[in-house]
Curated annotation (Swiss-Prot):
Native source species: Morus alba (White mulberry)
Entry keyword annotation includes Amino-acid biosynthesis: no
Residue ranges annotated for the Chitin-binding type-1 domain, each copy included: 3-13
A biological process term (GO) from this entry: polysaccharide catabolic process
Catalysed reaction equations from the record: Random endo-hydrolysis of N-acetyl-beta-D-glucosaminide (1->4)-beta-linkages in chitin and chitodextrins; Endohydrolysis of beta-(1->4)-linkages between D-glucosamine residues in a partly acetylated chitosan
EC top class, as a word: hydrolase
Subcellular location: Secreted
Enzyme Commission (EC) number: 3.2.1.132, 3.2.1.14
Coiled coil (UniProt feature): none
Top-rank taxon: Eukaryota
Role, per record: Has insecticidal activity when consumed by D.melanogaster larvae. Has low chitinase and chitosanase activity.
Protein keywords: Carbohydrate metabolism, Chitin degradation, Chitin-binding, Glycoprotein, Glycosidase, Hydrolase, Plant defense, Polysaccharide degradation, Secreted
Claim: Coiled coil is one of the keywords in the record: no
Protein name: Insecticidal protein LA-a
Amino acid sequence: SEPQXGRDAGGAL
């Protein structure tokens, strides 16, 4: 996900 999405808070865009 995004740097701070709310779900995983970090991933591959």
